[in-house]
Amino acid sequence: MMTTSLATVAVIGSGTMGAGIAEVAAAAGHPVRIFDINPKAVDQAIEGIAGRLASRVARGKLASEQADALLARLHPAHDLAALADADLVIEAASERLEVKTALFAQLAAICAPSTLLTSNTSSISITAIAAGVKNPERVAGLHFFNPAPVMKLVEVVSGLATSTEVVEQLCQCVSGWGKQPVRCRSTPGF
């Protein structure tokens, strides 16, 4: 079920949303690198995912082999450089524009020009986030709803510079993850 053109996924932020998004991508067969400024938070996120999977196995909702395979696809990243070869980056960090713009500028310098850089933001302008990014056509919003593993809807948010091809690629990826993509323009509250 893995979307091959976006084979490796990186998730930045390991709170509730970041962990849920990492679980969704790993469940779809992607190797997932998880980065957080607090390395212990990444370990806690993976432990939380393991606990939720164990509960599903105990209830007969998931085979233990599937749970083990999903967990084996989750990899802690100890610095942003470890995300350099990701095909898709999903940022789920602090909802502060200055944090996101600095982070996306760093990612643009580290990752290949073909890497799709996305934010899970629900309120910050994608156009503003992309303003300082080389190749801003690859920047988009990928807004999951909480809890990400359960909720089917994902907003694919385009900024002024986001290319149609990037939006299409993200919609195909999200559909491959069993989610329902909804295309949105970057406006207040989408």
Give residue spans per PLM region.
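Phosphate-coordination loops involved in phosphoryl transfer and adenosine-cofactor binding
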Residues: 5-8, 86, 114
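Hydrophobic/aromatic beta-strand patches that form the interior of the parallel beta-sheet core
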Residues: 33, 75, 90, 140-142, ...
